[in-house]
Amino acid sequence: SEFIYGSLHLFDPIINAEFSPQGVALRQFTSRWEGGMVRTSGNWLRDGKTLILDDAAIAGLEYTLPKNWQQLWMETTPGWLNSLQLKRFSASRNLIIDIDPDFPWQLTALDGYGANLTLVTDHKWGVWSGSANLNAAAATFNRVDVRRPSLALTANSSTVNISELSAFTEKGILEATASVSQTPQRQTHISLNGRGVPVNILQQWGWPELPITGDGNIQLVASGAIQANATLKP
């Protein structure tokens, strides 16, 4: 069996749900989607328009992001979804691709887990609370190949803290930490260190070209603002 809604195309979906005046109890949802499997359960509460997923798992996905995914991320959610909470989530062996010609990227064999994540608040997408860890076997960011990229973050009502952001390059390693405020100005601070890496590796990611070549150690500390109402750019 198939289910098609707009660009959403599910194969062999199984849904077990109970409806009541208080909302919907989703006992089971499983489906094949984009070459992989998705599974979840939880509740939608009419009071507060809150969707709480007790457990969500995604495995074997081969997914290309929509061309306008950055704009979609900025749009408000439908009236029935004021808040989205994930008590637990896991990801295994997923392939995620962005074909944006200005900054294409790909994550191969993406695994991850998280807990108590709030992804929608007041109809706005974001990472508003909780923790997540993600890692992949390999990745490409604007035609720069890296190995074993990993990320660890925690979020609360005031700040998203990235305590680990690292990847191996062809010869060396890049390591970074960062913080982003939850205010509309999105005040951002990043500290990056590279050991034994091409000194111009950041050029492909939007940094000005340096008048030197070869491998070496680099250190970068930067602060700025990522406006909440502006799309992300490299």
Feature locations, PLM:
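Membrane-proximal interfacial segments on either side of biological membranes
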Residues: S1-V24, G36-V144, P149, A155-V160, ...
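A structural feature that tracks compact, well-ordered secondary-structure segments
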Residues: R27-F29, S41-N43, L165
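Glycine-centered tight beta-turn/hairpin loop motif at sheet-sheet or coil-to-beta transitions
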Residues: G35, T169-K171
